[in-house]
Amino acid sequence: MALSFHKRVLSAERYESAGIFDVNGDGIPDIVSGNYWYQGPDFKKQHKIGGVTAHDEYYDDFSTIAMDINGDGRLDYITGGWWGQTLRWRENTGDYTKDWPEHIIAQTGSIESTRAWEVDGDGEMEFVPNTPGAPLVVYKLIRDAQGKGTGKFATHKLKLSGRENKDQGHGLGFGDLTGNGRGDFILRDGWLEAPADPYNGTWIWHPDFDLGRAPSVPILVVDLNGDGKNELILGEGHAYGLSWWDYRIDAAGKRTWTRHEIDPLSSQYHDLQWVDIDGDGKNELITGKRFRAHPQGDGGDKDPYGWYVFKWTGESFAKHVIDFGPLGTGKGVGIHFAVADLDGDGRLDVVAPGKDGLAVYFNQGNA
């Protein structure tokens, strides 16, 4: 694999989250990041969204998840952050001369990042913030009889057996670890087995592993080796390391997990995606450094950095460097980067936000 990308810097702004969706309803993807959206197809025209607050060198904006929340046919987005301690949605009113109204969904505690997962099997995504010092809660958009969003949410604090639901810890994943078709939650120090009814049933705690001090959001759950059971892929969000984990089950039903290194020499792998970036029909791991994830104190925080494609070979991962170097040359991917076909050529492109600026990487295919 020899993927080629054309890099274009859109902005020096230091927002760490970005999303790709059609803001103005013209059928063309746009880029949303922080206080601005960039109009496709050339992304040269910048429109203000407004309202994103700064806290030292951070912005309180750690996700950009598109959904029509109020059923008006326009895509809004879900965000939240550490300082505001709220999960929020920003309303796309269609009037792009004014700031987008912000609506608080819930007081959550400090949010590391939020992800959308299909938790209850109804075909619609729910929202799950990773709140290291607060409970695991699922937020479900309430829809009307026509299936349109109402702008209101149901709050589901999960019932747990084997541990209290009061402190998630840093890191969160979701996927089927039992093979029964239900999504389980993966935390830093174990996993929660899903009941048949996720909101009224009891989730069973399995303290099977210790994934480190601050695993990534998300922790990916994928069947890497085709053995019919899912493995875990995770980065160290504030230290060195990128790894995958598999397990064996003994005669008594006990799971024993084994860690396999992917990249122990790079650090601050905070966001990961599992997509087919080279078009061969098989997914690859896309990730990179979250530049200045903490202002100081993280392992490798002053190293040269970049983002990478890791290709599964059947036994391990091969690392392909897409961008790398010191500040001004290399580029990280922030806390919530975005992947989609921006230019309609059938290839997935990458939008990389971060404190080191906002850049687009147009996928040129295999060189």
PLM regions and their residue ranges:
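Beta-propeller-forming repeat regions
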Residues: 1-367
